[in-house]
Amino acid sequence: MEINGVEIEDTYAEAFPIKIARVLITAVTKRWAQVAATEATGFGTSVIMCPAEAGIERFASPSETPDGRPGAYIQICTFKYEALEEQLLERIGQCVLTAPTTAVFNGLPDSEKQFNVGFKLKFFGDGMESEAQIAGRKVFKVPIMEGDFVTEDNIGAIAGIAGGNFFIFGDSQMSALTAAEAAVDAIAELEGTITPFPGGIVASGSKSGANKYKFLKATANEKFCPSIKDKVENTEIPADVNAVYEIVINGLDEASIKAAMKAGIEAAVTVPGIKKISAGNYGGKLGKYQFKLHELF
């Protein structure tokens, strides 16, 4: 299969189950919503070494938020609900409560699983906190130096999916990077997914385990490293490819990840110099979800 003259390899992305909390952060301006969302999702690229995977899903206009202010939806992802609640408390408490003019609302109010994160955060008020209603939602007002920090009582979570992905092969580092940026920008317009790596892009895609250093649980995926393609048996790098980037996608459900992969690939192949689109899988050893590239189109 080819799209815009770019080969779409007949392969699939392998993904795995993960627990996802969705939080809406609002602020007086989009800038401050983005600042708080960025801080709250820091150190959240991969559960290989990070305590959670996290990212900004999309921005919200004032017309769609409970308090009528600009906002940002974020997702925080862990393997277990217990760890997820801990991450919510730490990230909201340290990165959103401390940010100017922010408020926190439940991004999954209808989900079965709910954490009383707001109830716990209210104790920062040391007895001076109060209960209120905003757009029919139970919130707590916590007095702080600038006024009140508002947080909804509960934050919802669901069983989601992590590790949807595709690889972008370019004839140069800049062509591959430009295509990866275009892919991330396209995905950012959609609802339900995040791209948790720096700027949404993975420069150092890994394989599970190691060939030599057995004490590591993840190491460089040498078959996708252009600088050593002449040294690696069964390299996946064609002769005319000099850079590869991976886009990793977490999402609330399969449909959201499929839509994000499709939009990202369609954006990437419009960039001159892109030679091929592929995906990463581990023969079923990593996860139960398979997103076949050809079936996206």
Swiss-Prot record:
Record keyword Acyltransferase present: yes
Species annotation: Methanosarcina mazei (strain ATCC BAA-159 / DSM 3647 / Goe1 / Go1 / JCM 11833 / OCM 88)
Gene giving rise to this polypeptide: ftr
Pathway noted in the entry: One-carbon metabolism; methanogenesis from CO(2); 5,10-methenyl-5,6,7,8-tetrahydromethanopterin from CO(2): step 2/3
Pfam families (UniProt xref): FTR (PF01913), FTR_C (PF02741)
Cellular component aspect of the GO annotation: cytoplasm
Enzyme class: transferase
Lineage, highest ranks first: Archaea, Methanobacteriati, Methanobacteriota, Stenosarchaea group, Methanomicrobia
Family from the record: Belongs to the FTR family.
Subunit structure: Homotetramer.
General function of this protein: Catalyzes the reversible transfer of a formyl group from formylmethanofuran (formyl-MFR) to tetrahydromethanopterin (H(4)MPT) to produce 5-formyl tetrahydromethanopterin (5-formyl-H(4)MPT) and methanofuran (MFR).
Keyword vocabulary terms for this entry: Acyltransferase, Cytoplasm, Methanogenesis, One-carbon metabolism, Transferase
GO molecular function terms attached to this record: formylmethanofuran-tetrahydromethanopterin N-formyltransferase activity
Single biological process term from Gene Ontology: methanogenesis, from carbon dioxide
Protein name: Formylmethanofuran--tetrahydromethanopterin formyltransferase
EC number: 2.3.1.101
Stored InterPro entries: ForMFR_H4MPT_ForTrfase, ForMFR_H4MPT_ForTrfase_C, ForMFR_H4MPT_ForTrfase_fd-like, ForMFR_H4MPT_ForTrfase_N
Catalytic reaction list: N-formylmethanofuran + 5,6,7,8-tetrahydromethanopterin + H(+) = N(5)-formyl-5,6,7,8-tetrahydromethanopterin + methanofuran
Protein localization: Cytoplasm
